């Protein structure tokens, strides 16, 4: 019986395959076989025995493991018994503890997951950077506190998001060495069962798996690395939600500047035929909150008794799997949304013009200061003019033209030029181009 939405609604097939039960067991078998090969290299068993065991070990099924676990109440020992049953090899699991297998197999899953996330983060950063260049001269209304602010450009907005996503790409690279480690260190981390062979056996196992050995561990690898990973996913999810949220704000009927793609046969509402709801962005916002919610239980799972207890185990079966699958889901969704987004240039211009020049009050204030008026005095003159414009439902220009304190410094045509949004963009264009160059360099 399927009860979890990840099974039937959320997540990509490629990521769900990595975290499936069958995949987990196959990776744990792979770790056990790497241990046998390392033991063979040290002479505990013959190379031939290790090779023969490997041929048969992958016939172990989740169903058989569950049958044994139902009887003995221990999942890893059930796996060990199933492998021993399939291979006939008496050296299976020699010197190892359960989490030597679990944590090392998890590192393999995380490595494969990071490969997928890395490609998609790169893709999203590139799409955002391309949009930034495409829209670098599309002047729009900037908003702070939800209210009209200075003009900006859509290219600037997309460049801001592109830079943020590119920083996540950098963080992912930096995290790999700390996260992608395995262990073969025994019950309390001392490698006692291996004697003086411990370092060499562990290093050989990790070489075969293309992992690095943990510098030190108890019965388990310290969970600070898992905490860092979930914090990374939470941080990524926050960025994705921020982009999606702003897309939703800009799609509101009274704004109408931007629109996520709406398919020809797509239905927006079961009762309102006209609706074109931003469901992809809403989906991202909802699931991003779930991803961030896994950070706290993972932090709690890092706090264990002495050499370890089992309180982390049940939680991590959920936190690692669901956070990874859902983060990949919303990342995939945002690539789709950003790639196909469209701008309504008419509405963008309309929203600028609706401000009647009030959002350019700073531009006039700055120019007045340059022409000899004290900055604070100029601020008050412009504030008073703006308040009159609100009260009279007039334009800022109308009020300024009637104010002698202003007009002794300006001609009318000068004010008109100052109050053109495209004339007050500072280094917006250059900053967009700088960001795009940097993003492309990061993603090389």
UniProtKB/Swiss-Prot annotation:
Pathway: Purine metabolism; AMP biosynthesis via de novo pathway; AMP from IMP: step 2/2; Purine metabolism; IMP biosynthesis via de novo pathway; 5-amino-1-(5-phospho-D-ribosyl)imidazole-4-carboxamide from 5-amino-1-(5-phospho-D-ribosyl)imidazole-4-carboxylate: step 2/2
Enzyme class: lyase
BP terms from Gene Ontology: 'de novo' AMP biosynthetic process; 'de novo' IMP biosynthetic process
EC number(s) per entry: 4.3.2.2
Keyword set, alphabetical order: Lyase, Purine biosynthesis
Domain of life (superkingdom): Archaea
A GO CC term assigned to this protein in UniProt: cytosol
Residues reported to bind N(6)-(1,2-dicarboxyethyl)-AMP: 9-10, 73-75, 97-98, 219, 270, 275-277, 283, 314-318
Subunit structure: Homotetramer. Residues from neighboring subunits contribute catalytic and substrate-binding residues to each active site.
Family: Belongs to the lyase 1 family. Adenylosuccinate lyase subfamily.
Task of the protein: Catalyzes two reactions in de novo purine nucleotide biosynthesis. Catalyzes the breakdown of 5-aminoimidazole- (N-succinylocarboxamide) ribotide (SAICAR or 2-[5-amino-1-(5-phospho-beta-D-ribosyl)imidazole-4-carboxamido]succinate) to 5-aminoimidazole-4-carboxamide ribotide (AICAR or 5-amino-1-(5-phospho-beta-D-ribosyl)imidazole-4-carboxamide) and fumarate, and of adenylosuccinate (ADS or N(6)-(1,2-dicarboxyethyl)-AMP) to adenosine monophosphate (AMP) and fumarate.
Protein name: Adenylosuccinate lyase
């Amino acid at each position: 019986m399927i009860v979890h939405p990840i099974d039937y609604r959320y997540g990509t097939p490629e990521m769900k395959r990595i975290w499936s039960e069958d995949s987990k067991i196959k990776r744990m078998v792979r770790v056990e076989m790497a241990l046998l090969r390392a033991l063979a290299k040290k002479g505990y068993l013959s190379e031939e025995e290790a090779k023969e065991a490997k041929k048969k070990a992958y016939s172990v099924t989740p169903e058989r493991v569950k049958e044994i676990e139902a009887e003995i109440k221990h999942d890893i020992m059930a796996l060990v018994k199933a492998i021993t049953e399939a291979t006939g090899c008496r050296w299976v699991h020699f010197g190892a503890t359960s989490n030597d297998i679990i944590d090392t197999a998890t590192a393999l899953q995380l490595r494969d997951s990071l490969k997928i996330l890395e490609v998609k983060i790169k893709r999203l950063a590139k799409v955002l950077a391309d949009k930034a260049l495409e829209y670098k001269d599309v002047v729009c209304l900037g908003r702070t506190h939800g209210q009209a602010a200075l003009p900006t450009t859509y290219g600037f907005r997309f460049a801001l998001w592109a830079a943020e996503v590119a920083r996540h790409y950098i963080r992912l690279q930096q995290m790999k060495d700390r996260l992608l480690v395995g262990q073969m260190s025994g019950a309390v981390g001392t490698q006692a069962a291996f004697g003086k062979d411990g370092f060499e056996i562990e290093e050989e196992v990790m070489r075969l798996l293309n992992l690095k050995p943990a510098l030190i561990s108890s019965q388990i690898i310290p969970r600070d690395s898992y905490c860092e990973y979930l914090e990374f996913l939470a941080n990524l999810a926050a960025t994705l939600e921020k982009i999606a949220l702003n897309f939703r704000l800009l799609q509101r009927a009274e704004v109408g500047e931007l629109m996520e793609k709406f398919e020809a046969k797509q239905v927006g509402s079961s009762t309102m035929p006209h609706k074109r709801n931003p469901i992809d962005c809403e989906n991202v916002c909802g699931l991003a909150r779930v991803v961030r919610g896994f950070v706290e239980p993972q932090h709690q799972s890092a706090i264990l008794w002495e050499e370890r207890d089992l309180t982390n185990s049940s939680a991590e079966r959920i936190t690692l799997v669901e956070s990874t699958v859902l983060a990949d889901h919303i990342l995939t969704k945002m690539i789709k949304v950003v790639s196909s987004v469209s701008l309504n240039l008419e509405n963008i211009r309309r929203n600028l013009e609706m401000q009647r020049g009030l959002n350019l009050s700073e531009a006039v204030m700055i120019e007045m200061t340059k022409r000899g008026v004290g900055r604070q005095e100029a601020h008050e003159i412009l504030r008073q003019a703006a308040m009159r414009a609100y009260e009279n439902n007039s334009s800022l220009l109308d009020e300024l033209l009637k104010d002698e304190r202003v007009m002794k410094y300006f001609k009318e045509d000068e004010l008109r030029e100052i109050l053109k949004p495209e004339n007050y963009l500072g280094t917006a264009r250059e900053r967009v181009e700088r960001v795009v160059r940097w993003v492309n360099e990061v993603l090389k």
